[in-house]
């Protein structure tokens, strides 16, 4: 059986996202594009995961809670979780304390919107989310595993924010089983 998926989707919460990237728009576009499985992987946060999970459930799409964590070395790593609760706990206990308290400049990066399942704004994250955490690239896999999550280096072959562009190598000794 073939499955069509996208495990690297950002919402209106990510600074690189657009205000149109609401839970319903994400899921409805996924349906229109024939996707069976999606993961929301905003930068260093899971605050819109619960809303997208609910919309995906109603639409019959398999949803995987996720996050795109930026390491201390400025490498992006997708973390995919078994549940919304595990993702939110990982953010609260591991990522949030490791993210510098630098304010988001809304004039440049836009509003980082937290939305409900009806696309209503219920808050905003005032920290600049697309920033390096103090978590090292070789510790992400171990930390994610504590929450039964899988860590996968993101866009590994891109010229920025990837294992190859920053370190020039990818090795299983770094704790990743998937590249």
Would you name each region that the model predicts?
Residues 1-73, 167-173:
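An N-terminally biased module of ancient metal coordination in phosphate/nucleic-acid-related enzymes
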Residues 2, 54-178:
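Extended substrate/RNA-proximal surfaces in nucleic-acid metabolism proteins
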